[in-house]
């Protein structure tokens, strides 16, 4: 039997919507990254963007295990002397853009390079329950019911 290689023109991309309310962040990110890469498909080809378009709603209601809300810190430097800054995970989730927490968690699970950047463009994250993609008729994927450990 000959090895199957999918061509970009043959790829059928689906739209899926995932509700992040009460779902553990790392488990959600790992499932979303698998979907974005297309590894859930039997026709997976590593060098082709064949993953789904993923919409995540209620990003501000994602859960973290342990004491990560208070203890996990993110650092950056402004470039000026003494310009090191930091925020806790709790500050990021209660700040202006809570969806960035999920975006970064997924981005760090996707391969780095041009294909990974293309696959990240297929991810849309919204802080609230509404999204503007109803016309695509997205299929609902319930991550919380896949495994009892996924939900808190």
UniProtKB/Swiss-Prot annotation:
SUPFAM superfamilies: Ribosomal protein L13. One of its GO terms (molecular function) is structural constituent of ribosome. GO terms for biological process: negative regulation of translation; translation. Keywords: Ribonucleoprotein, Ribosomal protein. The keyword Amino-acid biosynthesis does not apply. InterPro entries: Ribosomal_uL13, Ribosomal_uL13_bac-type, Ribosomal_uL13_sf. It comes from the Bacteria. Part of the 50S ribosomal subunit. PANTHER family: LARGE RIBOSOMAL SUBUNIT PROTEIN UL13M, RIBOSOMAL PROTEIN L13. HAMAP family: Ribosomal_uL13. This protein is one of the early assembly proteins of the 50S ribosomal subunit, although it is not seen to bind rRNA by itself. It is important during the early stages of 50S assembly. Belongs to the universal ribosomal protein uL13 family. This is Large ribosomal subunit protein uL13. It comes from Paramagnetospirillum magneticum (strain ATCC 700264 / AMB-1) (Magnetospirillum magneticum). The lineage of its organism: Bacteria, Pseudomonadati, Pseudomonadota, Alphaproteobacteria, Rhodospirillales. The gene is rplM.
